[in-house]
Amino acid sequence: MKATRLISAAGDEIGTMSTMDLKESIRRSEGRVVMGQHLLFTGPGLVRGVTNSKLMFAFGADMVMLNTIDLDDLANNPGLQGLSIEEPRKKCCRPIGVYLGCPKAELKDDGKKELYRLNGMIATDEHVQKCIDLKADFIVLGGNPGSGTSIRDIVAATKRIKKKFGDQVFLFAGKWEDGIHEKVLGDPLAGYDAKEMIKELIDAGADCIDLPAPGSRHGISTERIREVVEFVHSCKPGTLAMTFLNSSVEGADPDTIRLIALKMKETGADVHAIGDGGFGGCSSPENVHQLSVSLKGKPYTYFRMASVNR
């Protein structure tokens, strides 16, 4: 297809993009792409009759990632309100992807009551194939808080998935949360070299490297993330980088989001994500809107808000 920028692409253009077209459209957007995160297990959402995904698109998000999806029981995803992944994707005319976890291989359901089914979102080959079949536009590999996921687990999953599925999957990979037992990627106190791990992820086939956002994750500076983003872009030209505003700070006030957004922009990352730690399974619509305005200004934000059905 003709190359275009995601931030100015209409719905009919987005609908015809391949996985690698989408990747290129993000690169061409020059650091202004906003990704929302939709937590599915908490309930139907903030507004009756409207999914959180659609709400975030209406407030300026360019992409949405679905978290805690149960791929073994698709009816067990309250936040989708009975829809499949493909249905809101078609209705919103925007890229929708899936967050898959990479916990230790020995993880088992132990009979304890969990907030959500951990095994339903593990990055198995079967789940990846299901994401492809359900028309997910991208997959994000990581580890939710409390999962005990190591960056090495994520490298191994990246290598396995890209070897089997290739460019059928637009693959994001990294570690921006779950930092209790092992520090996140880019933390100066991590017991591993961030650049070495990033190179391993890129060599394994990752299309985009996920990093914590300065100002949201404790101990993470703009200078440090800027340094690793530069490494991502130079290690293999065309590889993207994403900063992730989470660690519950996504539930702060819009003024805080504005300040962090400017730090995120300074890192040089291509995608800027905001977490789901608000009320009802996503950050507040006002915070999504503020992130969008701070990163790309009002004209492109208003375009995204007004072009849901274009």
Task: Cite the ranges covered by each PLM segment.
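Short beta-strand elements of ligand-binding domains
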Residues: G97-L100, F172-G174, M242-T243
